[in-house]
Amino acid sequence: VFNHCGSFNKWMDRERIYEGQEGYAPGAYVDEKSPYRSFFKFHSEKWPYNKDYDGWWGHDTLPKLNYEESESLCEYILRIGQKWVSPPYNVDGWRLDVAADLGHSPEYNHLFWKRFRKAVKEANPNALILAENYTDPASWLEGDEWDTVMNYEAFMEPITWFLTGVEKHSD
């Protein structure tokens, strides 16, 4: 999942698993000088142990990654995108969870996924980029971002109607 991580991830370390451990830099929750601080959006300067950060859908156990303000995070994720589709791993592509929710704006999301596609396709032109999307995917499928989508609502709506006669399952 590229739009958030777990609060236990070494980048955040809310559970303080890595705090004081040899070989680990302090997490962004633990120390304002953490090398990972820019990976997250904090709303206060309450360190140590700053609980005031964006969580995916408001969940503090799922800290939302802050691509817009961290070029180092972007570059790190782009390298991951390339690494796994290259030798010796040679995976066939990427399945992107909640891809349209990556950043804080649709405009930024489109910019990032264009960069991601370019990086992945440079490493492996045949790699597939499959994104989870739950709205109209047309703007993402213009040949410069995702190759295809999986859409739970588009699948569930007709199945639910067929099985139950209920027109919408997601109200």
Residue spans of the language-model regions?
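Active-site and adjacent substrate-binding regions of carbohydrate-active enzymes
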Residues: 1-171
